[in-house]
Amino acid sequence: YLETGEEWPAAAWESCKTADAILLGAVGHPDARLPNGDLAGAGVIFGLRFGLDLYANVRPVKLYPGVAHKIHDEFKQVWKPNLVDFVVVRENTEGLYTPARGTLSRGGSDELAVDSRIITRKGAERVIRFAFELAVHRGGAPRDRKHRVTCVDKSNVLAGDRLWRAIYDEIAPKYANVERDYAYIDAFTQWIVRSPEAYDVAVAPNEFGDIATDLAAVLQGGMGIAAGGNIGDEHAMFEPIHGSAPKHAGQDKVDPIAMILAVQMMFDWLGTRKGDAALTAAAKGVEAAVAGVLKEGKTLTYDLGGSAKCSEVGTAIAEKLAPVRGRRAAAKKRAR
């Protein structure tokens, strides 16, 4: 944007509409602002979410063995790997992030700002149903292995959330093998820290899910290894959930694992959508390679307590994948 005055090339939107899947890198720079004061780059993210109707923001929260947590500027294991494995499904096209907002100015001074929060039946139904379908295919909560969907809202205060919870209660009985669970967003933020093992899938309105997933990233080791998917009925986009970290640009020091796990999520989604076993196997291979490097603990970037470069972590993960690729190539050759 600083060079061209455009957030992205005009042809990029058309390419995204026809792509099998979209992989998005982190965007944004504090010096790159639109004439209205908004950060340049947000139009790319929201343009794709709204334009392609990517209504389900899927955020896996999984702690891999070997990952230490940075608490009080010290690295130590606080949560246990076998007890942190849940997914937050965040509604992605409504809530406070819809462009229904404005300001009132008097005498050159902004006196009033309004952000309208939109919750519709259609929007709530489809993302809540998505969460239940996801729970059906998962292994359940670590504590008891029960399939469970937690409805996260603030229905004791907000009218939109009363509609949200009512729709959840309409959908839940259709999934007899999935347990119902409820949490107000303020309580949920402490419960996932205290007892993450109780959760399997949680579903939340847009802004609540946004806040909760950033907090949940701490449980898995931080934003540097947190990936997410933006999924609709016809399209999907995958991304690391962290920002662009311009202060680290060009230093080869940031953690590449969030982006690599975004690729893993993309392979998994494509494999399921297309019925392609090779893509599904690729997703499993990438995750296993990441898990192997994390468990060894020898090649980690600064955010995980190590001193390795970004490129060194990428190389270590690629080396873990090499034997897998070799075995599959040999098997394919024998099959011929």
Go through each PLM region and give its residues.
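Solvent-exposed alpha-helices and their adjacent loops that cap or buttress functional pockets
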Residues: 14-17, 51, 76-82, 141-143, ...
